[in-house]
Amino acid sequence: MANGQYLQFVDADDSLISSNYDKCLDFIRFKDADIVLFDFATKEVSSAQLANNEVFSGTEYMHNNNLRASACGYIFKKNLLVNLRFTKGILHEDEEFTPQLIIRADKVYNTKVQAYFYRKRKESITHNKDKRWKLKRLQDTEQVIKSLQDKADLMPAKDRVAMLRRVAQLTMDYIYNIIILTRDE
């Protein structure tokens, strides 16, 4: 288990962009942020960018913004994890995890800073062409949608609306992926 107050996930092939990531850490140092969101770069970025100072609750953020669910796209307070874990055995498990995490936060900063270097790989799960994998991806997405819908049904009204917005986004992605992943090549 991690020892610090904050957690950051990093894929083994990727890295943090130090000068820009330091800007994100300032929100932790000086603003007591619960979650700091940042952008990915696919090319090396040399200069630090200015960060956005606007703060939202997690519910407000989800209600008013399209969520990028990658667990590598933010740093967060470890105490938000109470009874929240990734579902084992499913693809894109962060699609289920991230909205539940964000909705728990009181102070979310969306910096727009490119602080994470994402290395594109042909062998990644998003590029897999195997039919069994495509079917699993669709089934797992459906499972995530149902899970978030069930959780939304138990939430207070304001949180429920925000979570249902995310469910609607995932449902549209699911429909799109059915078309893309099942068409003849």
Tell where the protein language model's regions lie, with residue ranges.
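Conserved donor NDP-sugar-binding/catalytic core segment of glycosyltransferases
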Residues: 19-48
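Conserved nucleotide-sugar donor-binding catalytic segment
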Residues: 58-132
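Glycine-rich, basic loop-to-helix element that forms the pyrophosphate-binding segment
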Residues: 1-3, 23
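The conserved acidic donor/metal-binding loop of glycosyltransferases
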Residues: 11-16, 34
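Short aromatic/hydrophobic "clamp" motif used to bind/position activated sugar donors
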Residues: 7
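Short, flexible, basic/aromatic active-site loop/helix in glycosyltransferases
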Residues: 39, 46-66
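Short acidic donor-binding/metal-coordinating loop in glycosyltransferase active sites
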Residues: 4, 12, 40, 88, ...
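C-terminal subregions of glycosyltransferases and related glycan-biosynthesis enzymes
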Residues: 119-185
